[in-house]
Amino acid sequence: IIALVGTNPDFAGINDWKNISGSFITENDVKDATKVCVLGLTNSRRFFGAEDPIGKKIRINGIPHVVIGVLEPKGLTPGGRDQDDFILLPYTSLNRLLFRPDMSNIVTVLMSARSSEELEYAKFSIIKILRETRNINPGEDNFDISSYEGVTKKILGTTKILRILLTSIASIS
């Protein structure tokens, strides 16, 4: 299974990714729903070996897409997940490829903010847009908004529980 990620030009900056070759998805790629893609290093090697993939085509759901870039490797997460095993497409192209051309099927939205105030305003704006787009009222949300801060707190909470559990097990032994 290869992760297809629909995105826009801001994705690279938000995730601190840089191209090792080629370019990244542009606003025009998004606007025109062009059939281009950017590969993680794992998929670049999987499809093309040591060969330069820029300008070559791969088929996604039988439709040819031109490789315009390859991103620098991120390696494995602490949990062992390969962070380079993906294909990035303009989100408009992915929606046309897999779903309807409207944005009702977007699964994940990533963003960054310069301050906590901007982050709160952005979260509020996203919630408002999602409710309007999905025609739902407050309390009927069928989506979730998470921040890295929230995820970090959950991880730290889980780590604390595991530490307590491991301490208890060690005490019993």
Predicted segments with their positions:
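Short intrinsically disordered, low-complexity coil segments enriched in acidic
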Residues: I1-T7, A12, I155, S168-I172
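Mid-to-C-terminal secondary-structure elements
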Residues: A3-V5, P9-I25, D29, T34-I136
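Peri-transmembrane interface segments
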Residues: L110, E118-L119, K123-I126, N137-I172
